[in-house]
A protein has these predicted regions:
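Phosphate/NTP-binding elements of NTP-utilizing enzymes
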Residues: 1-330
Length: 330
């Protein structure tokens, strides 16, 4: 006998309807993804989501764009309202998360045409996108219609004053300068909507350049200088074994859930594969960029005189010889 699902309706819907573009099969989330998604999207008895902003930051090739696409699709189906795929430029806004949603619908049209005709607005049956937008049919969505997903580059003035229910900021490490700050400010979650969320996918940025992302990291994730195991944010109940942190009280305005991982958890990403990326002649002399993309660590964009591993090895060797660092907490 099959045990009843413990997933929230939002996670169940994504696994029931969202096709991956590379394999053309329905998504099946890894256990750690499933736990985080259930925590982020399990509404309370009043139907309110626990967090206004969710950050999903992992090393390269950990499925960030696929997660963003599945969530954007699921949002339009379950919560509805106006949804935006946002990015640093037009190509990135249209070719990443938004493009995954389009490909999902193309695969759905082949594999489950009746569902496709049911959920996509009649005017979009033959052509999935029009004017950078996908329109979804009226169903049992929680937010008022119209229900659509639109991709928008960083032109905040063109979309000012909208009624956004959902926004996805893709690769936020690339958001730099005052214009990007104003763009961010325009797309805040709206309390007037029954459900409204801001979702961020990214890996780490550069010190002094990725100001928006650094502000979030510094507030929620950055380790205490005296104890690296202590973060500025608080561990999330039931997720204490994962690098997931909370800022603000759940179900309250301004609340954040931040998943900031340094591990390569996909089973195909063996240590040999990761080291192979490090030994690639094309990245020779750019150790910091390898660490940023494959370890999800903040860097300056400039190379250190000595690699961190060598420094650690020398410190251990010195300690074994009786040398003690009396200022290690300074």
């Amino acid at each position: 006998m099959t045990e009843p699902s413990t997933d929230c309706p939002f996670v169940e819907l994504m696994e029931r309807e969202y096709y991956l573009d590379d394999t053309k099969v329905l998504v099946e989330f890894p256990p750690h993804h499933r736990r985080i998604l259930n925590k982020a999207f399990r509404a309370n008895e009043e139907g309110k989501l626990p967090y206004e902003t969710v950050v999903w930051s992992t090393p390269k090739k950990e499925g960030k764009t696929a997660i963003g696409g599945a969530i954007a699709y699921g949002w339009c189906r379950h919560y509805g309202g106006n949804a935006f795929s946002l990015a640093n430029d037009k190509d990135q806004a249209g070719e990443r998360m938004f493009d995954r949603v389009v490909k999902n619908l193309q695969i759905m049209r082949e594999k489950n045409e009746s569902l496709y005709l049911q959920i996509v607005d009649e005017g979009y049956h033959d052509r999935i996108t029009k004017n950078n937008m996908i329109e979804f049919a009226e169903g049992d969505q929680i937010n008022p219609s119209p229900h659509w997903l639109k991709f928008v580059p960083a032109d905040y003035a063109g979309e000012a004053g909208g009624r956004q229910a959902f926004t996805c900021f893709d690769e936020m490490w690339a958001y730099k300068g005052d214009a990007m700050s104003r763009f961010w400010d325009e797309f805040v979650p709206l309390s007037i909507m029954p459900a409204s969320l801001r979702f961020i996918t990214t890996y780490a940025g550069w010190y002094g350049e990725s100001e928006l992302l650094w502000s979030i990291y510094d507030t929620v994730v950055k380790p205490d200088p005296h104890d690296p195991h202590i973060k500025h944010g608080t561990p999330v109940p039931e997720l204490e074994d994962l690098p997931v942190y909370q800022y603000g009280a759940a179900y309250q305005p301004g609340s954040y859930l931040v998943y900031w991982d340094h591990e390569n958890r996909m089973p195909w990403k063996t240590p040999a594969y990761i080291e192979g990326r490090r030994d690639d002649p094309a990245v020779k002399g750019r150790e910091s960029e390898w660490r940023r993309m494959w370890k999800n660590e903040w860097t300056t964009g400039q190379e250190a005189f000595l690699p961190a591993e060598l420094i650690d090895e020398l410190m251990d060797m010195a300690e074994s010889k009786g040398l003690v660092n009396h200022m290690k907490h300074w």
